[in-house]
Design a protein with these regions (language model features):
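Long, well-ordered core segments of solenoidal/helical folds
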Residues: 256-303, 334-357, 391-410, 434-458, ...
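Solvent-exposed, conformationally flexible loop/turn segments
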Residues: 155-156, 194-199, 223-225
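Well-ordered alpha-helical segments within folded domains of soluble proteins
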Residues: 240, 304-325, 369-383, 411-427, ...
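Polysaccharide-binding surfaces and accessory modules of carbohydrate-active proteins
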Residues: 10-127
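Beta-strand-rich recognition/accessory modules
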Residues: 31-36, 41-43, 63-73, 107-192
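Extended acidic/polar, glycine-enriched regions
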Residues: 205-266
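Aromatic-lined, polymer-binding surfaces characteristic
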Residues: 351-439, 445-452, 456-476
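Solvent-exposed, low-complexity, repeat-rich "mucin-like" stalks and linkers
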Residues: 186-209
Length: 550
């Protein structure tokens, strides 16, 4: 049945009757240069919506488009209001613009089916972009614009895009449903990130009978399993795009060859020591690790939260302390002296070691109250204790932990609270009284998070991966410390929700990488909102999944 403008997509068997389309952007609107025109047709067959877009070139001379010349809107409900609304009426949109094989796997944030799927059945998409209301800042991913692949148009030429929207029951069902479409090539890599000298087997499975399959022009033979396999390896670091062609159908797979962590850490630490530590005339900043502008080759420091000398900058001190413990650094003496200076800065400007107060900015300025700073400070002093064995650092870590919970930390979702490490180090040091104190605090914290369940309170963002992951991580660490089964069950409830943030596209930016779409604004020089895959907090999911697997 042909329908007009589509303003809602609601699946008939959805008890929540969620509208998957947001109301502030039109569906399947086409943006193109003035020399082009577009016609959009929509047809419904039960819960399946077919959208066909024909773009015509009306100019008098040839026109070569690029991947951004033409865009088609797909306004999904990927935005954060409150956690209860998100659970039932919002989605994580996992988008793959892989030329002829392009799709969207949208998962309801609470995990309940039906979910939404979209698959391209005609044409080619090479990219997507996002339009958003900047007033909503981190709480709205925005409207997706799908961009057709570059094309050469002669006068009178047309281009057709067609896709189908359908309900599905989750990841596995979505993948199965893709097999029904004749323009789909299923691609999986054994590893999307490898180190020099390693290999990654890429499996290619067309959903249609194939005569010729190539990767970067190299022909492949079908295996006994009925699929095609390509062994990727490269000694040179960097991004690699595999161009996959099955007869006339094209798609891609993106892989990354990355330096080994110990080599990368050594280079990073050397850069911090050489370029990011302050030794200038301002006493307040002596020894501080600061942001660095790689274009202008200068240190960056403003009173603004994300560019001051506190907060996330603590991670630089943690990294150097850990690298020193593992003997990764060539100039150990220089790095250790640098860390001593940073340690002195931290005690002088950011922390009250006696009370455990952690300030947001140097000068012991705590006018902006932020509990996120506490677990990072605990981790920093723990790493210093492990490196130097000075009891004051261990005591400071305990005091900071106690202060965190004095300030209603039991209802907070901290990123990287080192529960297991603190308990282990107190055990080793024979500090049984402190061990009992912090263990009881951690247990109360986990109990509170289990009681809250998935009705998460808003934090710096209304709802996000780094609210759900800390819930899973805190509860899972308390299970590791106590061995009590209720904490494992509580963590599993959180992990089921956490997994929904991760995509499964054949691209190292997206595969098993949690959705984050605001970090480029808060921490980037360009101050641009938009998808940031991967971001360093994306690694937190891996931390939790690894702990759960153990």
């Amino acid at each position: 049945m042909r329908v007009g403008n589509v303003k809602e997509i609601v699946f008939s068997k959805d008890p929540k009757q969620m509208n998957w389309l947001r109301e502030d952007f039109p569906y399947a609107e086409v943006k193109c240069p003035p020399e082009f025109s577009a016609e959009v047709q929509n047809e419904k067959d039960g819960d399946v919506l077919t959208t066909k877009i024909v773009v015509s070139y009306n100019g008098a001379h040839p026109y070569f488009t690029n991947a951004g010349s033409i865009g088609v809107s797909f306004p999904l409900q990927d935005r954060y209001t409150d956690s209860v609304t998100c659970r039932d009426y919002r989605c994580h949109a996992h988008v793959f613009c892989g030329e002829n094989t392009s799709y969207i796997m949208a998962l309801r944030m609470g995990g309940a089916a039906p979910h939404l799927g979209m698959v391209l059945t005609k044409g080619s998409l090479s990219a997507y972009s996002i339009e958003r209301d900047l007033k909503l800042q981190s709480n709205d991913r925005g409207c997706f614009w799908l961009h057709p692949s570059a094309q050469e148009f002669a006068p009178g030429d047309t281009m057709t895009l067609e896709w189908k929207v359908f309900p599905h029951q989750g990841r596995e069902d979505f993948r199965e449903k893709l097999r029904a479409f004749s323009q789909v090539i299923l691609v999986d890599a054994e590893q999307y990130v490898i180190y020099p000298g390693e290999t990654s087997k890429v499996t290619i499975e067309p959903t249609f009978p194939a005569e010729k399959v190539t990767v970067n022009g190299v022909s492949l033979e079908k295996t006994e399993k009925g699929v095609y396999e390509y062994l990727f390896e490269n000694e040179k670091t960097g991004e690699y795009v595999l161009s996959i062609c099955v007869d006339e159908v094209k798609t891609i797979c993106r892989l990354l060859v990355q330096e080994r962590p110990e080599e990368l850490a050594a280079k990073r630490c050397a850069f911090i020591v050489d370029h990011q530590q302050y030794h200038g005339k301002i006493k307040e900043l002596q020894g501080a690790y600061l942001p660095y502008d790689n274009e202008e080759k200068i240190l960056v420091c403003t009173p603004e939260n994300d560019f001051n000398a506190g907060r996330e900058r603590t991670g630089m001190g943690v990294l150097i302390a850990r690298a020193l413990q593992q003997n990764l650094l060539k100039d150990r003496e220089k790095a250790e002296q640098s860390l001593r200076e940073y340690h002195a800065f931290y005690l002088r400007e950011l922390v009250n070691a006696a009370t455990g107060l952690v300030c947001n900015c140097s000068g012991k300025d705590n006018s902006y109250f932020r509990l996120y700073n506490y677990p990072w400070a605990v981790t920093f002093f723990l790493e210093c204790w492990k490196l130097w064995g000075e009891k004051e650092d261990l005591k400071t870590a305990v005091h900071i932990t106690e202060k965190f919970y004095e300030q209603d930390g039991f209802r907070f979702y901290p990123i990287e609270m080192p529960i297991v490490m603190l308990c282990q180090e107190l055990e080793k040091a024979g500090e049984q009284e402190d061990l009992k104190t912090v263990r009881d605090l951690f247990r109360r914290h986990a109990d509170q998070l289990i009681e809250i369940g998935t009705a998460y309170p808003a934090s710096e963002v209304n709802y996000e991966q780094s609210i759900v992951q800390p819930a899973a991580e805190v509860i899972l660490q308390v299970y590791e410390v106590t061995g009590e089964e209720k904490y494992l069950c509580g963590a599993e409830q959180q992990i089921a929700v956490l997994e929904l943030f991760d995509g499964q596209q054949p691209d190292y930016h997206l595969h098993e990488i949690a959705i984050r779409h605001w970090d480029g604004y808060w921490f980037g020089k360009r101050r641009v909102f938009g998808d940031t895959f991967p971001h360093y907090w994306s690694a937190e999911n891996g931390r939790t999944f690894k702990r759960y697997a153990r």
